[in-house]
Amino acid sequence: MNEVKIQEEMKRLKGTETEKNLYHAFAGESMAHVKYTLFAQEARKDPEMSQQLADIFDETAKNERAHAKIWFWLVGDLKKTTAEHLQMAADGENDEWTSMYPKFAETAKKEGFPQIAFLMNKIAEIEKQHETRYKMLLANVENEKLFKKDEKKLWICANCGFTCESVEAPVECPVCSHPRSFFAIKAENY
């Protein structure tokens, strides 16, 4: 692959059939990744199957994910900022709970599948929560509140478990030297 030539081609992709094909390829590879991961989990449960089979499903799933990443990179979506990714995620979740799942549930109900309709409606409720979460995270990023709060919070280092109470996460963990990006507000819900 010639990086310079690829960059040039990427500039001309917008609105082309090739761009559509890349999105379709991304969707197909993404679906294969999930499908093979699930197949691996099922193979591990089956005492009649070799664990090697599960490992091969996992290996292939990893390959499919790598393929999906290539196609997603080519359409430029991986080059966007994290804030843009959060907005894209919120938009996608919004479409799922406001349009896709309600339509699918209605079709399932009309065709005599009330349990499937029920599940689709419940999944739509979860997608709404996902949208809310992404919007809150985006607001934190835009308002520079990801690592700084108005009140003291208990921050925890995801690497070593160090905690401190402060309005702001440490720039660096004083125990393991991991950067601020490893800190989150400690949430105990047990």
Question: What kind of region is each of these model predictions?
Answer:
Residues 2-190:
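Non-heme di-metal
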